[in-house]
């Protein structure tokens, strides 16, 4: 019976380990970049608030600009219908 020290690692096994390590390191690097970007976005919103802008409205506009025009129009129609039903318009 061979001991673990005497067993030579197969090249395919070493390749898989190296590949896994590279993937994990890439994910960690991207997570750090994501945190940095989130901090930058938060700073921009703080700057906007300091200049008197309504941050909630800015966030709504940013979210709406990401939507497809048809999807946004449909959502606005539904919102308007609900507001009319509740006597808000």
Curated annotation (Swiss-Prot):
Molecular function terms, GO-annotated: DNA binding
Family: Belongs to the UPF0335 family.
InterPro entries xref list: GapR-like, GapR-like_DNA-bd
Domain of life: Bacteria
Top-level taxonomy: Bacteria, Pseudomonadati, Pseudomonadota, Alphaproteobacteria, Hyphomicrobiales
Protein name per Swiss-Prot or TrEMBL: UPF0335 protein RPC_3979
One Pfam family, short name: GapR_DNA-bd
């Amino acid at each position: 019976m061979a001991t673990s020290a005497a067993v030579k690692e197969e090249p395919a096994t070493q390749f898989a380990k190296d590949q896994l390590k590279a993937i994990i390191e890439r994910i960690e690097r991207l997570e750090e970049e994501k945190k940095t970007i989130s901090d930058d976005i938060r700073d921009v919103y703080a700057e906007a608030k300091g200049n008197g802008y309504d941050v909630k409205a800015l966030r709504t506009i940013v979210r709406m600009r990401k939507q497809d025009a048809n999807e946004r129009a449909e959502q606005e129609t539904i919102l308007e219908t609900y507001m009319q039903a509740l006597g808000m318009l």
